[in-house]
Design a protein with these regions (language model features):
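Bacterial N-terminal signal peptides
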Residues: 9-22
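Signal peptide processing junction and immediate N-terminal pro/mature segment
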Residues: 21-30
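Extracytoplasmic small-molecule ligand-binding "clamshell" domains
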Residues: 31-108
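Periplasmic-binding protein-like
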Residues: 36-50, 124-134, 213-253, 259-286
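Bilobed "Venus flytrap"/periplasmic-binding protein-like clamshell domains
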Residues: 46-70, 105, 128-188, 192, ...
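Short helix-initiation/N-cap motifs at beta->coil->alpha
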Residues: 79-90, 176-188, 225-227
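Acidic, polar ligand-binding/catalytic clefts
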Residues: 82, 87-145, 156-158
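A ligand-binding cleft/hinge motif common to bilobed small-molecule-binding domains
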Residues: 101-114, 191-219
């Protein structure tokens, strides 16, 4: 889920907010400073643990929503990109968006509180979150990593890792956790011997060959594939908006939206049934 720093593609995204026409999308600063036209449809992107530039992801989102607003016949669409649920929560409370693009863990973690309903999924190049791996230099099985140090920048939501990512293969408590902040820091912790093993995602494993010492690292376990991007409606979204968005969801990356999607690495947006992730939701909710 080439390493374009499309932190989204989830997110999503190429014209900047400075070029916004009347029927358009407000940039991050404009969202806070300029009143939106009546009927503006709100969006949010929550993309956790991604690599790349958040400001670039925001510009891609702005461009994508500009295209979507025109296609859907909305007066305007505006959105903001976040890498932390805590910061996204305040934005949601203040602006009450109708729709969101989420990494899978963020979707599961924010679903109940916000009445989120899955509408679609999309693939995303080099943004991560589509599959997870345990890697090591010295261990050759997952069991050999248990009880040892495990570096990860994906441990903020232990429940997501324990009941969804691992598929019951392990719990984070099975390891001596070494929490990291940046994707490359996690990989280098194993390369430099600061941790015996590491939990990383598909974006990180794709960079191993480009990092000094990366050739000595190998996967010892892999998760099932997961959706890179969940497209969801909020419980407060008007039914008319939901119906309209559903009609245009699979055309997000067509026409004027193609450039934004290409820049963000977003591909193949497609609709799903509302209960498509019922099993994962039930497991996460406990």
């Amino acid at each position: 889920m080439t390493a374009r720093p499309s932190s989204l593609a989830i997110a999503l995204s190429c014209a900047a907010a400075l070029l916004v026409p009347p029927v358009a999308v407000a940039g991050a600063a404009q969202l806070e400073e300029v009143a939106q036209p009546a009927g503006t449809v709100g969006f949010i992107v929550v993309r956790e643990n991604g690599s790349g530039s958040a400001s670039a992801a925001q510009s891609y989102l702005d461009a994508l929503l500009t295209s979507l607003a025109k296609r859907a016949g909305w007066p305007a669409a505006s959105g903001k990109y976040f890498t932390k649920r805590s910061k996204a929560k305040k934005f949601i409370e203040e602006t009450k968006p109708s729709f969101g693009f989420f990494s899978f863990g963020a979707y599961l973690g924010m679903r109940k509180a916000n009445g989120l309903t899955a509408m679609g999924v999309a693939d995303a190049n080099a943004t991560g979150g589509a599959q997870y791996f345990v890697i090591s230099k010295s261990a050759f099985t997952l069991d050999a990593c248990k009880g040892k140090t495990l570096a990860s920048n994906h441990a903020d939501d232990a429940r997501f890792v324990d009941v969804v990512v691992s598929g019951d293969a392990f719990d984070l408590a099975d390891f001596e956790l070494v929490e990291t902040k940046r994707p490359v820091q996690t990989v280098k912790a194993v390369i430099n011997g600061e941790a015996e093993c590491a939990l990383i995602d598909d974006a990180q494993i794709s960079t191993l060959a480009t990092i000094d010492g990366g050739a000595a690292v190998h996967p010892v376990w892999a998760s099932e594939a997961m959706p890179a991007v969940i497209i969801a409606s909020f419980g407060s979204a008007p039914a008319e908006q939901v119906d309209t968005f559903a009609k245009h969801l699979e055309a997000l990356c067509e026409g004027d939206g193609k450039g934004a999607c290409d820049a963000a690495g977003l591909t193949a947006p497609r609709k799903v049934e509302a209960d498509a992730f019922a099993a994962q939701q039930a497991a996460y909710d406990g």
